């Protein structure tokens, strides 16, 4: 019997001296043998909450990164200067949302000094960034909804940054004072979920952690209450932005109420302190996705839309592009105006359109078309006809003398014929004498 007890003590002694050997011998399914036990929750298939939250947070990181690129790339296409002034604050909000998704991994892994310090400090700071940006946006929306003119972009961003710096100072002082006080007391102070050392950030009680977030809750409450007056402004086109903020803050209030109750009361009542870390991780992932779905995506979809004032000016003074289609449209409009002569003035056409001396030229040689001269026409006259009738004798006519044209007109020929008929012949015979019409008697 004594030999049996001694054998049991010899076999059990290495387990007490080397507790890591027992942990390495019980690797959860899905994890490799050489993995640090700190990261077992990331691959443990028996407790799937870590893998699910890891996938949700990874999808959120990718989505937030893509939305940030889209928002920054759309800056040259933003026509409304009032919306452009909010882009800096919205990019700052996206960075805070990206940090919330990354902080989920710190809550999934098992607690140690670094992970607990990041949880206690970054949890309040990252939420303060998001809620400060929402509060600054509400501050600008109240001006825009009433006056259609808000503060400048750097003013809005400065307001969000100053509100965030307040939480940074609060968290820094709280974390330092808590650690220094715990190390000075030296007592076995700790959390109900684990017996950590006094100076460790993981030794902070759940109630103390929630009390340190009072300023963040005030930011959330201010953004929620400030969104209501923006819905009653005179300029209705800013109401939808107020609805986005109101829906986001209302969802955040519901999430915060649930996780605070579970973190401070529910887990303790059900004797399950190991669910403290999953509670924080679920709250981070749920609230970050609420920011993306209810605020970021609607704002990105509205950022490139023009204001009603710019649309009205575009209708009054349309932009004229330089291109082939524009030239064709202008020529078509001019031709339609010229061809429509229903209400045009009665003016001579020659005065409007000067005739070119080459308008009758069709590209053919002149020798191909027979054009008789005046002498050729004179020689073709039959010889038995009276030359006086064909070529009448020129007389002293006032109209002919006053005319500067050398070409005979019809009335000149008629007057010459009548004069020849009235003059009797000199020799009494019907003689035919050729008289040159260009020589005066």
From Swiss-Prot:
Function: This retinoic acid-inducible G-protein coupled receptor provide evidence for a possible interaction between retinoid and G-protein signaling pathways.
Protein name, per record: G-protein coupled receptor family C group 5 member C
Coiled-coil regions listed in the entry: none
Single GO cellular component term: plasma membrane
Domain of life, per lineage: Eukaryota
Pfam families, per the entry: 7tm_3
Positions annotated as glycosylated: 191
Residue segments, region Disordered: 412-441
InterPro entries: GPCR_3_C, RA-inducible_GPCR3
List of residues that carry Phosphotyrosine: 414
PROSITE patterns found in the cross-reference section: G_PROTEIN_RECEP_F3_4 (PS50259)
Induction profile: By all-trans retinoic acid (ATRA).
Membrane topology of this protein: Multi-pass membrane protein
Residues that bear Phosphoserine: 344, 383, 403, 406
Cytoplasmic topological domain residue ranges: 72-85, 142-155, 230-241, 301-441
Keyword Transmembrane assigned: yes
Modified residues (Phosphothreonine): 423
Topology feature Extracellular, residues: 24-50, 107-120, 177-208, 263-279
Annotated organism of origin: Homo sapiens
């Amino acid at each position: 019997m004594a030999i049996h007890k001694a054998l049991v003590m010899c076999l059990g002694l290495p387990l007490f001296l080397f507790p890591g050997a027992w942990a390495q011998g019980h690797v959860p399914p899905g994890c490799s043998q050489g993995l640090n036990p700190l990261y077992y929750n990331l691959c443990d298939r028996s407790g799937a909450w870590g893998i699910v939250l890891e996938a949700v947070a990874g999808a959120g990181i990718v989505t937030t990164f893509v939305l940030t690129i889209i928002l920054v790339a759309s800056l040259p296409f933003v026509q409304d200067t009032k919306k452009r002034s909010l882009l800096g604050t919205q990019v700052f909000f996206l960075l805070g949302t990206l940090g919330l998704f990354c902080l989920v991994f710190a809550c999934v892994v098992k607690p140690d000094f670094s992970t607990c310090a990041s949880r206690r400090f970054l949890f309040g700071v990252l939420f303060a960034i998001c809620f400060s940006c929402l509060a600054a946006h509400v501050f600008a929306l109240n001006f825009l909804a009433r006056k259609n003119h808000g503060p400048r972009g750097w003013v809005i961003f400065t307001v969000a940054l100053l509100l965030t710096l307040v939480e940074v100072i609060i968290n820094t002082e709280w974390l330092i004072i808590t650690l220094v006080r715990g190390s000075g007391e030296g007592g076995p102070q700790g959390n109900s979920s684990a017996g950590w050392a006094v100076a460790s950030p993981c030794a902070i009680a759940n109630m103390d952690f929630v009390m340190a977030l009072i300023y963040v809750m005030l930011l959330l409450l201010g953004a929620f209450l400030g969104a209501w007056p923006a819905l009653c402004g005179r300029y209705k086109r800013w109401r939808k932005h107020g609805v986005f903020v109101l829906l986001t803050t209302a969802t955040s209030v519901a999430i915060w109420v649930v996780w605070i109750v579970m973190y401070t009361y529910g887990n303790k009542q059900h004797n399950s302190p190991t669910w403290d870390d999953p509670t924080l991780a679920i709250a981070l992932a749920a609230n970050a996705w609420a920011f993306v779905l209810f605020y970021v995506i609607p704002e990105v979809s509205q950022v490139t839309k023009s204001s009603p004032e710019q649309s009205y000016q575009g209708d009054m003074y349309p932009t004229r592009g330089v291109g082939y289609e524009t030239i064709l449209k202008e020529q078509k409009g001019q031709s339609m105006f010229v061809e429509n002569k229903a209400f045009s003035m009665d003016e001579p056409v020659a005065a409007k359109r000067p005739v070119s001396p080459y308008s009758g030229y069709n590209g053919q040689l002149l020798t191909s078309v027979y054009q008789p001269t005046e002498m050729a026409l004179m020689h073709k006259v039959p010889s038995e006809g009276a030359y006086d009738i064909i070529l009448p004798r020129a007389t002293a006519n006032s109209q002919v003398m006053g005319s500067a044209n050398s070409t005979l007109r019809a009335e000149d020929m008629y007057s010459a014929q009548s004069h020849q008929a009235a003059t009797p012949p000199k020799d009494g015979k019907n003689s035919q004498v050729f008289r040159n019409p260009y020589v005066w008697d």
